[in-house]
């Protein structure tokens, strides 16, 4: 039952061409097939909720220098046990990982979809089916606070430099979508 809300979002989503189209197809099939798609115990993988967060005036976006991955990524994470609303997962994770309480959803529909192969040595290799939403930190007086999951948090106006060893096409794709969103909002 709880998968239906997410499946409606997936069926209505129009991805960018290429890699994201394939990610949408695979994510939709995963959610249709696995009733435990929100649970970390699902052997194939699980859903994660992430956030592209813009600042109060829409001029910058927030990224985390991830403690385990060792490069800049959008904020996000796993559903808690029994949590089945992926937008709420993204909002909760964004607030927890940034320390910002004023984060709101700019649009309740999916902003981007990616799939990551994950292996940390503690768990068997599995997939993260990552659903991203466009969020906004609306209070200009709030300051970001680095959580245990990050080494750093920073507002950017352009994507950071990467050394070429990371799969970060999604960061550039989301940056371009965000710029298009800003143009439409003018």
Residue spans of the language-model regions?
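Active-site segment of metal-dependent pyrophosphate-handling enzymes
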Residues: 99-141
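Compositionally biased, intrinsically disordered linkers/stalks adjacent to structured regions
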Residues: 173-186
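Generic N-terminal amphipathic, Lys/Arg-enriched alpha-helix
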Residues: 3-14
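Short, well-ordered beta-strand micro-motif
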Residues: 53, 134-136, 154-157
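Conserved Nudix-box catalytic region and its N-terminal flanking loop in Nudix hydrolases
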Residues: 59-100
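NUDIX/MutT-family hydrolases
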Residues: 143-174
């Amino acid at each position: 039952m709880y998968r239906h809300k997410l499946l409606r979002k997936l069926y209505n989503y129009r991805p960018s061409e290429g890699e994201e189209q394939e990610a949408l197809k695979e994510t939709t099939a995963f959610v249709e097939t696995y009733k435990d798609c929100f649970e970390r115990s699902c052997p194939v993988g699980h859903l994660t909720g992430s956030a592209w967060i813009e600042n109060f005036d829409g001029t910058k976006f927030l990224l985390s220098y991830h403690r385990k991955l060792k490069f800049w990524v959008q904020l996000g994470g796993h559903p808690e046990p029994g949590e089945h609303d992926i937008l709420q997962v993204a909002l909760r994770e964004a607030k927890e990982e940034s320390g910002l309480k004023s984060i709101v959803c700019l649009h309740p529909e999916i902003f981007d979809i990616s799939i990551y192969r994950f292996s940390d040595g503690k768990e068997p290799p599995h997939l993260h089916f990552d659903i991203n939403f466009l969020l906004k930190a609306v209070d200009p007086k709030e300051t970001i606070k680095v959580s245990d999951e990050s080494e750093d948090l920073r507002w950017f106006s352009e994507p950071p430099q990467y050394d070429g060893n990371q799969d970060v096409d999604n960061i550039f794709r989301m940056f371009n979508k965000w710029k298009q969103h800003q143009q439409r909002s003018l």
